Amino acid sequence: MVVIRKTSVMRSSFIGIYAKAWDDVAFITKMADEKTVNEFREVLQVDIKRISIDGSTLIGTMIAVNSNGIVLPYGSNIDGLDGIDGRNVLYLKDKINAVGNDIIANDHGAIIHKAFSNKARKEIEDTLGVETIRTSIGNILTVGSASVLTSKGMLVNPETDDDELEFLKDFFKVSVKSGTANFGSIYVGASIVANSKGILVGRDTTPIEIDRIDDVLS
């Protein structure tokens, strides 16, 4: 049974900007307290890496990950990124560097911001080992901030139309629904941290939103 729990990171409901998860690992800002780290470990059931990127706490905005690889900003000084042998690691050199906000991926595909260069798209594709396309989701270019994707399901912002939902379902090979978190925020990627084993949502997320999130990601 997938566990879903309300929480905060550094007193913020927008937990997705401070953390990123996949099925075997999760990353969280080094500034998170021990109680928060333990909660993430318990719910997500994975090893938790406490890291900083160039001294920033905004880990979730700067990491894209699937089973094959990790994408990080070029030239970044990363503290705590160890024990991830077996994955491809790309330090992406492009005018877009908030890669966590601008890439959404699982082990079947990746969607990236339209402004990524052809070279960047190919490097991301090679690193994550999946077909990679440039497009928006629900008219939002920062696809990672406005959607949540696991190996089981995908939640996207409410502006996503039926044709897009069907395309995303076929492309990522998971169930897809639209919804909000944190009392109406369309930026669900900034509000949720999830993998196939557990779901953490921002503390302002309503019971109706939780039911929707649980339905698609569980």
UniProtKB/Swiss-Prot annotation:
UniProt cross-references to Gene3D superfamilies, sorted A to Z: L-arginine/glycine Amidinotransferase, Chain A (3.75.10.10)
GO biological process, one term: cytosolic ribosome assembly
Record-given protein name: Translation initiation factor 6
Keyword Cell membrane in record: no
InterPro entries for the chain: eIF6
UniProt cross-references to HAMAP family, sorted A to Z: eIF_6
Record keywords, A-Z: Initiation factor, Protein biosynthesis
GO molecular function per UniProt: ribosome binding; translation initiation factor activity
Functional description taken from the UniProt entry: Binds to the 50S ribosomal subunit and prevents its association with the 30S ribosomal subunit to form the 70S initiation complex.
Family according to the record: Belongs to the eIF-6 family.
Pfam families linked: eIF-6
Coiled-coil intervals, chain numbering: none
Top-level taxon of the source organism: Archaea
